[in-house]
Amino acid sequence: MIRSLILSTLLLIFLAGCSIFGSDKQAREPIADGLTPKALYELAEDKFSSGSIEQGIEKLEVILAAYPGSKYAIQARLDIAYNLFKRKKYNRAIIQLNEFIDRYPALPSTPYAYYLRGVIAEEKSSSILDKILTDSAQRDVQSVRDAYSYFALLIDTFPNSKYSEEVPKKLIILKNILAKHEFYIALYYTS
C-alpha cells in the first residue's frame, strides 16, 4: 500500500513537471515564423540595402537554422561571411567561410569562398592607420601568412577559376612582406 502510494506520488510529480515544460508557447513557435527560405532571404537583402547589416545577418542565420538544406542556406552562408567582412568582424567571417568550404567543397561558388577568405585575412593584416605609420613587415604577420596560405590553396584547388587569375600577384606581394619581416628579425638579432 505504501509502495503504491509512493509510486503514485512520483508519477504525479513527473507528469506535473512535463506539463510545465510543454506549456511554453514560444518553444512551439517555428524558428522562421512560417516564412519560406526565399522570403527570409529577401528580408535579409532588404535589411542589407537599408544598412541594417546585423539584422540582415540574423535573417540569414534563421535560414541556416530552419532550412539548412535549401539553396538559400548555401548562399546565406556566403552572404553572412561577406557582411561580417564589411563589418570588420574578420574572425567570424573566416569561420563562416571555413564551414562553407568544409560543407560544399565542389560547388561553383566554392572558389569564391576561398578567394574571399584570402582577401579577409589580407585585410585583417592591415588597416589604413597601420599603412601610414608602420611598415607591414614590422607588425605581426600571422594574418599575412594566413592570407598567403589561403590564396595558395585557392590556386592549388581551383587553378582554372576566375578567382585564381589575380592571386599570383597577391602571392608575390604577401611573400615580399613575409621576406621583409624575416629581414627585420635578422637585423634585430644581429645588431
Spans of model-derived segments:
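Sec-dependent bacterial lipoprotein signal peptides
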Residues: 1-18
